[in-house]
């Protein structure tokens, strides 16, 4: 290394590039999760492909400049916004493929069962090139069936799973034990990631 430090590249294992850099548009004054979700929901209808590309490219440049060589980004879609952000993130994955490895997670932020049409979009996202299947059982009902469905999709496409899991203030309604049991039952050990587990 000629007197310099040589280390493997760093990994950003959980980011939402399609929703990054929006705090200046509508601030989260309370700093709470509830307001963050509310503010983001208000802003999402204003996102265009050009807007997402500009913001996500800025984020990519920041990550690359700080030594990140592998990124897993959750990219959402639903019937009201379509694939605006998701398609843009897939485009950036291709554009930056010689610089950074990007894994795109098909992420149903608004739930699958409570948002009709999202289940079909999950399959479409996998066909479009998603690298992993996302889940958010705490924001859907019934939560265990949400977990079952995303496993079904992951198995169909032989992809890993990445869950936003039990992101709440209390322990009521937690599904992490069910998720662990399901992971073992399906032989998916080592292929399931969990984030936001705060209960």
Residue ranges and their predicted role:
Residues 4-6, 23-74, 80-95, 120-127:
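Alpha-helical scaffold segments that flank or form the walls of functional sites
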Residues 4-25, 168-169:
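Di-metal (Zn2+ and/or Mg2+/Mn2+) metal-binding site signature of metallo-dependent hydrolases
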Residues 74-79, 108-110, 139-140, 167-168:
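Conserved short loop/turn motifs at secondary-structure junctions
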Residues 39-55, 105-117, 136-140:
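Active-site mouth loops of central-metabolism enzymes
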